[in-house]
């Protein structure tokens, strides 16, 4: 198994590192994300009409971006809860009005999402939920 990225991906890594090195340290989050999106470094698989850069999904590039951003001096991370769970769900199953209303502010960090559920015996693993019904008189 070859775990090396290869020249194409190393060039991509170098581009991102150069972008991060040249970005002013006092840049605000919104401007930073807009610039990174315009260059195709973040939100690659999200359509342009929602604020993405509309490129094919590439898990290796996604990994390189995450590694470079995590190693950067910038305090922002690409909120996996918001952009990794909510946005793909909206793209796949959301109504048009939901996509238009929620995706753009989520990508810019203006909307932050979280999960708020926990069930006895399952925690946050909703796939392991169990239920049962019991007939009591005429009602279940």
Which residues make up each language-model segment?
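Amphipathic, small/basic residue-rich leader segments at the start of a protein or domain
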Residues: 1-81, 98-105, 136
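Residues at alpha-helix boundaries and the short loops/turns that link adjacent helices
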Residues: 26, 92-96, 109
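Conserved short loop/turn motifs at secondary-structure junctions
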Residues: 48-53, 86-92, 118-121
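Glycine-rich, Trp-frequent "lid" loop and neighboring beta-strands that shape
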Residues: 53-55, 97-140
